[in-house]
């Protein structure tokens, strides 16, 4: 147990620490709670002392530390004197804060402000009065400037018209200085004589400084609508266009920015610039290297070209497409690239400018910016590429662009995906190399995934399906592509697109894709299991009855429904069934749908391609003996015999093959007569026995030469042609048009037909005709 002496010794050892803690808290101006200082139960004091009865604390030391914060001490009399002095000078302090200019010079007023960072209450209250004072001063100065300018303008106008160029120069400098102040600027623009003198001087002077000052004055005036009108009325636009030929950069800058302001805000300025030859001058300036200057110049070109075909042709004649493409290829300044892409977008809907842009390398140059961080630049480039893509199907060196477009199909931006799909659709049409490249970079998987994600957005699904249709025929990787669609789970969604709510353009594209997919034997069973055959027959019956109805009422011209001719649907569906009929199980399904009478009827069609696909499907169906008998029973012999003399070799060959198969169980004498007839019909120039003709027609329709589609037809659908890029729509609304060409709100359902083996009236559900759209063909169906 500790002794009394031990406790006393411990207490004495702790005492200095307690005093140091108290001193520390006093210096920090904290109110000591008594916890850290070692005080026990007594109330804390202002000095931070513990027990007041503790006589061991050094009182002098504590008091000295308490007074350390004061630099000097004051007696009671001194405090009273200072207080009186402050009371006597209160009015002067208020006046000094609010109206310091009214004080006598050298007058000393005691300040109540201890910290310069914290204003006194009087100073804070004086701020509004100071602001008011400055406003009044500015108003007085403004009025002085206006009065000065008003008095000086008549004299300066005379000086600008002086014959002495030195005088004119001095006057131009003075007017330029006046135009920098708002009051005098308004006075100048309200004087038509002055503005006319400025314009005339700028146009006629040979002095660089005079030209710079007058152009600068007009630039300052152009920031006000009143100034723009004054410049316009004074004939300033032709003068400014003339200044675009100046060798001085500052004059060029003033001229182009003033013209830009006029084009943006002054009615009639566009026509005046065109008439003054502004377009030619601006195109010539595109070889400059100042990116900000080029940005303004290209924006002027966009304003002038938008909605004006004549301006587009002038830009073309002046070499604009090449210069604009060079800018896209050379610079990285975002605003310049954006304004230039806007000009190219406007020009890309012009049939004359389009090939010029493509030949200048526009597709490749625009493709360089598809991964830019600027969304507005990317979108403009995509719109332009989409408009150009139908004219670029023969372009070389598109590998980089195609790879980027395939990547963009995975974008979350619907507009980006729509454009990318449309561009790919056009670029893969009839271009062997492009098809190969897209397949090699994973295009099939990306397009199938795009269709799956798009749902019922036909502005995406239609171009994506068209691209798949192109990629699945007539190139080395076509068979791989046909398999890839199945392997990436594309067949169910493709067949689904044959059903409502799909519109005719999408249905036509889907029918063509199914026909190509059927070229791959591995797809026969899956397509059958997905119900493709019954739906194709339904669509065929509906389209055929529509054509029959129009023929019966005396219609001679082919009608369009949502831009699609029903004859194209008849041809497409029959062609797809023809390829599917290569599979025995598919032939059974096709025959079971009572289609043979319809196929025989199609042999009488006046359209040669329908005759060909009808004869083709009958050729494959006739491989089965029962089907051959049914074909003969429907009276097919007469039309088939007539088609033997067709000038179309495919039609004649198929007809011969059907007749040959129908004759297999006929007497030998009949076969001999038929052989003579076939030989004389098919081999007019080089006769050969029919039995040497082997199985003529059995291989026709193979992958390399798709029967039923115009292989020699050079026209095909351009995705921008259904409404894209029309100037009257405004460039930012171009995306409002559907690639499929159907009109929003005009929902034409394609209802399913429950039982095609009965001759029921299918005409009530047909969509009404729409002759406002142009037909389109695609050689890659």
Curated annotation (Swiss-Prot):
Stretches with biased composition (Basic and acidic residues): 735-745
Pfam family, one: Arm
One Gene Ontology MF term: transcription coactivator activity
Localization: Cytoplasm; Nucleus; Cell membrane
Post-translational modification: Phosphorylation by gsk3b promotes ubiquitination and subsequent degradation by the proteasome.
Region Disordered, residue ranges: 34-56, 735-781
InterPro entries in the cross-refs: ARM-like, ARM-type_fold, Armadillo, Beta-catenin
Gene Ontology, cellular component aspect: adherens junction; basal part of cell; catenin complex; cell-cell junction; cytoplasm; intercalated disc; membrane; nucleoplasm
Tissue: Expressed at intercalated disks in the heart (at protein level).
GO biological process: anterior/posterior axis specification; axis elongation; canonical Wnt signaling pathway; cardiac muscle tissue development; cartilage condensation; cell-cell adhesion; chondrocyte differentiation; embryonic camera-type eye development
UniProt ARM repeat ranges: 141-180, 225-264, 267-306, 351-390, 391-429, 432-473, 479-519, 521-562, 584-623, 625-664
Keyword line: Activator, Cell membrane, Cytoplasm, Membrane, Nucleus, Phosphoprotein, Repeat, Transcription, Transcription regulation, Ubl conjugation, Wnt signaling pathway
Alphabetical list of SUPFAM superfamilies matching this protein: ARM repeat
Record CDD domains: CTNNAbd_CTNNB1 (cd21724)
Family under the similarity heading: Belongs to the beta-catenin family.
Description of how the protein assembles with itself and partners: Interacts with EP-Cadherin/CDH3. Interacts with custos; the interaction is positively regulated by Wnt stimulation.
Cited function: Key downstream component of the canonical Wnt signaling pathway. In the absence of Wnt, forms a complex with axin1, axin2, apc, csnk1a1 and gsk3b that promotes phosphorylation on N-terminal Ser and Thr residues and ubiquitination of ctnnb1 and its subsequent degradation by the proteasome. In the presence of Wnt ligand, ctnnb1 is not ubiquitinated and accumulates in the nucleus, where it acts as a coactivator for transcription factors of the TCF/LEF family, leading to activate Wnt responsive genes.
Protein name as it appears in the record: Catenin beta-1
Organism from which the protein derives: Xenopus laevis (African clawed frog)
């Amino acid at each position: 147990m500790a002794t009394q002496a031990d406790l006393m010794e411990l207490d004495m050892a702790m005492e200095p620490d307690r005093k140091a803690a108290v001193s520390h808290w006093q210096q920090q101006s904290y109110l000591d709670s008594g916890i850290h200082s070692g005080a026990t139960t007594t109330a804390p004091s202002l000095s931070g002392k513990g027990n007041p009865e503790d006589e061991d604390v050094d009182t002098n030391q504590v008091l000295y530390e308490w007074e350390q914060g004061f630099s000097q001490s004051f007696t009671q009399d001194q405090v009273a004197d200072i207080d009186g002095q402050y009371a006597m000078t209160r009015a002067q302090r208020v006046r000094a804060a609010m109206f310091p200019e009214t004080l006598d010079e050298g007058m000393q007023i005691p300040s109540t402000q201890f910290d310069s960072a914290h204003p006194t209450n009087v100073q804070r209250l004086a701020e509004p009065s100071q602001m008011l004072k400055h406003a009044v001063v500015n108003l007085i100065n403004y009025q002085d400037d206006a009065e000065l300018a008003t008095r000086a303008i008549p004299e300066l106008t005379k000086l600008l018209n002086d014959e002495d160029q030195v005088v004119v120069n001095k006057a131009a400098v003075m007017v330029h200085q006046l135009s920098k102040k708002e009051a005098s600027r308004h006075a100048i623009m309200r004087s038509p004589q002055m503005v006319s003198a400025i314009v005339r001087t700028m146009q006629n002077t040979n002095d660089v400084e005079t030209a710079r000052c007058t152009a600068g004055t007009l630039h300052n005036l152009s920031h006000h609508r009143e100034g723009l009108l004054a410049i316009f009325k004074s004939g300033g636009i032709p003068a400014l266009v003339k200044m675009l030929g100046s060798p001085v950069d500052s004059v060029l800058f003033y001229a182009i920015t003033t013209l830009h302001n006029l084009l943006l805000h002054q009615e009639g300025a566009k026509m005046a610039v065109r008439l003054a030859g502004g377009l030619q001058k601006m195109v010539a300036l595109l070889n400059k290297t100042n990116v900000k200057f080029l940005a303004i110049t290209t924006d002027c070109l966009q304003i002038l070209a938008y909605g004006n075909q004549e301006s587009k042709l002038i830009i073309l004649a002046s070499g604009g497409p090449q210069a604009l493409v060079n800018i896209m290829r050379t610079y990285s300044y975002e605003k310049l690239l954006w304004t230039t892409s806007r000009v190219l977008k406007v020009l890309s809907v012009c049939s004359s400018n389009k090939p010029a842009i493509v030949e200048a390398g526009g597709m490749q140059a625009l493709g360089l910016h598809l991964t830019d961080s600027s969304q507005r630049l990317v979108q403009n480039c995509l719109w332009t590429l989409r408009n150009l893509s139908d004219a670029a199907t023969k372009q070389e060196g598109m590998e980089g662009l195609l790879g980027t477009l395939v990547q963009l199909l995975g974008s979350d931006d619907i507009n980006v995906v729509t454009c990318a799909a449309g561009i790919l659709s056009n670029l893969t049409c009839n271009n062997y190399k492009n098809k190969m490249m897209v397949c090699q970079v994973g295009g099939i998987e990306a397009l199938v995934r795009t269709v799956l994600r798009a749902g019922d957005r036909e502005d995406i699904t239609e171009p994506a399906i068209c691209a798949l249709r192109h990629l699945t025929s007539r190139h080395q990787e076509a068979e791989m592509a046909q398999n890839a669609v199945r392997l990436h789970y594309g067949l169910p969604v493709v067949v689904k697109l044959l059903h409502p709510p799909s519109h005719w353009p999408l249905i036509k594209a889907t029918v063509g894709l199914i026909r190509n997919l059927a070229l791959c034997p591995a797809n026969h069973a899956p397509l059958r299991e997905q119900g493709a055959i019954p739906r194709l027959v339904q669509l065929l019956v509906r389209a055929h009855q529509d054509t029959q109805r129009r023929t019966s009422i005396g219609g001679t011209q082919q009608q369009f429904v949502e831009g699609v001719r029903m004859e194209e649907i008849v041809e497409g569906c029959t062609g797809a069934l023809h390829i599917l009929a290569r599979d025995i199980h598919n032939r059974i399904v096709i025959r079971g749908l009572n289609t043979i009478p319809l196929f025989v009827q199609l042999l009488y069609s006046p359209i040669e391609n329908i005759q060909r696909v009808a004869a083709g499907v009958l050729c494959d169906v006739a491989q089965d003996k029962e089907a051959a008998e049914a074909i003969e029973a429907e009276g097919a012999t007469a039309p088939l015999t007539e088609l033997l003399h067709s000038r179309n070799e495919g039609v004649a060959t198929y007809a011969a093959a059907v007749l040959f198969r129908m004759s297999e169980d006929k007497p030998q004498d009949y076969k001999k007569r038929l052989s003579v007839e076939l030989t004389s019909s098919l081999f007019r120039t080089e006769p050969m026995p029919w039995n040497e003709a082997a199985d003529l027609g059995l291989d026709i329709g193979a992958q390399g030469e798709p029967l039923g589609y115009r292989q020699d037809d050079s026209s095909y659908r351009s995705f921008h042609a259904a409404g894209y890029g029309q100037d009257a729509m405004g460039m930012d609304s171009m995306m409002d048009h559907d690639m499929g060409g159907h009109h929003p709100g005009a929902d034409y359902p394609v209802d399913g037909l429950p039982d095609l083996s009965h001759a029921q009236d299918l005409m009530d559900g047909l969509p009404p005709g729409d002759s406002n759209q142009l037909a389109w063909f695609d050689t890659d169906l």
